[in-house]
Amino acid sequence: MSEFHRLYFDELLFDFPDLVKVQKDSYASFVGGGDTGFSISDIFASVFPVNDGYGRASLEFVSCRMGEPKHDEYGCVERGITYSAPLRAILRLVVFGDETSGEGSEGVSTEPAVKDVREQEIYMGDIPIMSKNGTFIINGVERVVVSQMHRAPGVFFDNDKARSISGKLNYIARIIPYRGSWLDFEFDAKDVLYFRIDKKRKLPVTFLLRALGLSNKDIFAQFCEVSECRLTKDGKWTVCFVPEKFKGVRLQYDLINAETGELVLAKGNRISIVLARNLYAKGLRYCYMDLEVMKDMYLADDLVSTKGEVLLPHGTKLTKEHVAKLEFLDVDSIKLVELKGNYVFSTVLQYDCSYEEAMLSIYRVVRPGEIPSVESAEKLFESLFFSPERYDLLNVGRIRLNAKFNLSHDESLTVLTKEDIFCTVKELALLQREVGDVDDIDHLGNRRVRSVGEFMDNQFRIGLVRMAKVIVENMATADFDTVMPCEMINSKILGAVIREFFMSSALSQFMDQTNPLSEITHKRRISALGPGGLNRGRAGFEVRDVHTTHYGRICATETPEGATIGLINSLAIYAKINKYGFIETPYRYVRDGRVTDEVTYLSAIDEIKANICQASVRVDEEGYIVDDLVYCRRNYENVFIPRSEVQFADVSAKQIVSVAASLIPFLENDDANRALMGSNMQRQAVPLIMPEAPLVGTGMEGYVARGSGAVIVAKRAGVVQYIDARNIVVASESKDDFWIDSYTLCKFRKSNHNTCIHQRCVVHQGQRVKKGDILADGPAIQKGELALGRNLVVAFLSWRGYNFEDSVVISSNVVRDDLFTSVHLEGFECVVRDTRLGPEEITRDVSGVAEEFLHCLDEFGIACVGANVEAGDVLVGKVTPKSSSPVTPEEKLLRAIFGEKAIDVKDSSLYLPPGVSGCVVDVKVLQRRGIEKVGRALLIEKQAIDAEKTRRDHELAVLTNYIYSLLKEMLVGKVALSTLAPISKGDLITEEALEKIDRENWWKISVDGISSIKLLRQRFVDRFDEINKTYEENFEKIRGDDDLAQGVLMVVKVFVAVKHTLQPGDKMSGRHGNKGVISRIVPAEDTPYLADGTPVDIILNPLGVPSRMNVGQILETHLGWAAYNLGKKISKLLDEGNYSEVKSLVLEIYKNDRKMMARLNEMTDAEIVEYSRSLRGGVPVAASVFEGPKTDEIERLLVLAGKDPSGQEVLYDGVTGEKFDRKVTVGCKYMLKLHHLVNDKIHARSIGSTVDTQQPLGGKSHFGGQRFGEMECWALQAYGATFALQEMLTIKSDDVVGRVNVYDSIVRGDNDFYYGVPESFNVMMNELRALCLNVEFCSDLEKKKDFGDLALAASGQ
């Protein structure tokens, strides 16, 4: 049974997906292809073939493949290079001759004949590879490509938000492609319809329609509402009654039912839409039409007599005379169009034009300043919207257009069609008539996610297009008789474009690697910023706000607190992104009122019409919904519906939150703002050297630990054959399929944020493991569960003012036991260059440096691993040649002795900067190719090769032992067919006899079934050679040289581990947004203690709870207190040997956890007791989000632990020993240490001066300071601190003479010294003299009087 099992208060019905699947799947589709359309092969196929433009040659794409990376992931980090693989493509150059082949319609040759074909595999560049954890390693640094939320391609309808003078909204439509020109339609205040291309000058829509080839008759058919009037036998005209046409109309004639002759409404009545629909429902289908109404209407079709004669052409406006002649004309029907409401037709009437005029006008708008022709205008118009090379809607854009307008075009059609434009114009006209609704741009059905694969597709396409232009240029000057494809390719272009994206794009970000949670959150982040996205300065409230479609897709809690709030979000834990880029969330099918286990994913568009109930709906044992009426969501509104109409159910109550928010127990009891802070602060928690999983968790801790990639997980089931501090070897037990998996543990590896990545083995040799079992814990992980902090005994108590305003009081026990001690790795780099005066040199012999600063260096001048270093110590000794100086007598002597000039060098060593001290844990030496390796580099290389050999030997030993055990089974019990002492021919082979023979000679024994033994031996040899080959390749990589920058000979990297203990000024927090700074570390004997003498670990201010409204921390404290004391109770019973009580207590604790009870019932008493030993530190519980324990369950556990159900305890003051006046809330709470450490912030500059008259700026990193300025002087004046003020202005400023005097006084032990004149005062004096003002010091009273008289005279008094 697993050692770590939480007490659950709910059931997990749907397992969690891979939490970084979004990144992995997107990149896999780019590299390997898929149904997304973004793949390397698709891009090659879209750009190639490339023709030279003269029909002489064509370069075609055949296929491509990705090679293997040169180094593994960690090797690239060590060397500071990109983790990438070479891309090679097979290109075919087809050269055409002068003659042609093939025949046209008249027997004339049409196609050029192929003269020559040359194929070649060409290196196209290096493509960055995604690591197994979903990151990229660029120049040795792990980076994450954040997914981007942007507006989906397709059509959008909106209004201008500002009403016109008439009070009417003007509506707009916009067709946005993924790539290509935008097409906008808009109304002006006079209801004239215009269009724009790429937001340029607008034109009436008539020009677009004419350019699309529409005549007036076509426009009538497409956009106008035609009323067909028929002549009855009694000579009256009837028209079809359409309720929408009569909306808001005041009748100009009596409304009479043409079928019954009944008067429905009298003339002058106004018809509302409701009344019109009621009349239609009562049977009104046709009504009589007054001839007077036909006046000012237009003919939608030619008015043709019954004999076929055209009496009036279409488009004719009916006048009073025309209407009067209707009854005399030989017609039985007429199609009419009313100008009111037919905005397209009215625009055509106002701004009519011909086809040629339309084309030329559009050309002038798109390309102003050029002289157009009709042919060039036609080509331009065709390329704007109907050419796949310049216009692309993607499959998602086509699907959205099809869904919006009920079209049936194929997904592969990714350009606009005429029908798309017609439907857009018709829909916009309906909106202007206030029929229909505008689109909500914040609806997730209108926004899609672009992931890393799509970004790579765009960059790759840009690179290939640039390469194609270069190919065309090279073809122009190429000799096609001899040229090969590789001579026309510049492979640097593609790599440069991709490199530019990873290095400069706002969406390629330095990975947040503080802890495993911060990593996984960064990979699941979705940003609305970046290229093609929003600008945080202009983004309004609506786009930042929570939307109803975010339910189950985007977390409503987790987002940054600053200027990007609402623009950067996180995926909900169950959400995934489909092939079109839309976010989907899972639901369980509900059939006939029964909630099934069948799960489907729905996008925001799919679930609009669905009836979806909550995961907490009450069901019976068979899954049938109990209640007759169920609270559901339909069209994003909450309604009660019958259970038979329910279609889907949420899979879990926690599906609406992100990974970080799902780790907060009792999240439902916290204010949203504090939950946001809690989510963000968990990502800032520093991994501790002794991590501890929370007693009160949510059940998500294990999933996050696995999904982060920080732990080592067994790939296959097997047996652990070998373990040490760095390696784990697992082998199979199968006789048919034998394999060996070797795992290497990370040791003291530096993260992006200088935290320590260190893995610890959690299995033992001989242990059987299943696929997916945890083999090694990583940073901030314990027993396979995320462990960001520690469980502490907390008291909510105001204590002597030390926890005022969120300050935190800590017991010295916490510091003494290193509960919150963390290790941080600082990396320092020393670069050895080849200068113009000669190469720099690594050496221990650095002149002018005291031996005490060189103590950690080895004989080669590089710090030893394991050395303790302090600020100012030399990590790498290095000297640099200096320029020549005048020859001294000593130098003359050296030249005379050695016959050459002695090298003049200066110290350029790498020193440990101020404020840093620790232990050297690793040294890396990288050397340029072609340079002989120095001693330390050879030593490091030998250590690495020895480590690889040790791993190889372990694998070979496991393989050998396994194979010989199988061979032994085959031989024992069989009759020998040959003699091999001590076994004779005909003897029965026994184990004892085999033990006397060397194992290598067992293969020589001949028995029946020798073919199977030969097969076993062949398998053994093949596997043996495979292992050796793998490690030989590793040896070559280790021995290989490094590619360094130009002029760099060597790079030495030294990593120093710095231990940070908890101290006042460090920032701590809980998981509920409750943060504070440590104000004091109190001796354990002075801290408040419980009745049994147990001192509390931490004291928090109770006033921090009610105003912040994060009551979840109180519930966590109570439940943690119960869990902690249950562990103490179990421990006491175990120590007493009362095992029956232990079993009863364990069964009572888990009685409401059905899965755990089922497992406990299968265990024996001894196994239950053994399991209970793992509960000594407390019973871990899972308070899932929205499904945690209720108050009565917490009280039950408190009573079971023997504690007051109120959760309060009697506390005694540790200083006085007196009992506090009332009971205090005491419990066990999970606390985190955040990376805002006081050691990284507090900085004191107590040495040295600065440049005269300038400020000592530069900050902590340069050991700088800040000026004691004017306002600071005022403060000292206000306090009357005259001597301190004088010191600040003189010897502590820029009084050079005074500083020398102070130094002399300190050396003599004298307290008296004299101040000098500050240099800044001398500067002021010289500036006054430059203004012809002479300033002198005077001490004589007479001189003062003289100066006073002069001043009075100058003022005229």
Swiss-Prot record:
The keyword Transcription applies. Its EC number is 2.7.7.6. It catalyses: RNA(n) + a ribonucleoside 5'-triphosphate = RNA(n+1) + diphosphate. It comes from the Bacteria. PROSITE patterns: RNA_POL_BETA (PS01166). GO terms for cellular component: DNA-directed RNA polymerase complex. Pfam families: RNA_pol_Rpb2_1, RNA_pol_Rpb2_2, RNA_pol_Rpb2_3, RNA_pol_Rpb2_45, RNA_pol_Rpb2_6, RNA_pol_Rpb2_7. One of its GO terms (biological process) is DNA-templated transcription. InterPro entries: DNA-dir_RNA_pol_bsu_ext_1_sf, DNA-dir_RNA_pol_bsu_external_1, DNA-dir_RNA_pol_su2, DNA-dir_RNAP_su2_dom, DNA-dir_RNAP_su2_hyb_sf, RNA_pol_bsu_bac, RNA_pol_bsu_CS, RNA_pol_bsu_protrusion. Transmembrane segments: none annotated. GO terms for molecular function: DNA binding; DNA-directed RNA polymerase activity; ribonucleoside binding. It is an enzyme of class 2 (transferase). The RNAP catalytic core consists of 2 alpha, 1 beta, 1 beta' and 1 omega subunit. When a sigma factor is associated with the core the holoenzyme is formed, which can initiate transcription. DNA-dependent RNA polymerase catalyzes the transcription of DNA into RNA using the four ribonucleoside triphosphates as substrates. PANTHER family: DNA-DIRECTED RNA POLYMERASE I SUBUNIT 2. This is DNA-directed RNA polymerase subunit beta. It comes from Neorickettsia sennetsu. The gene is rpoB.
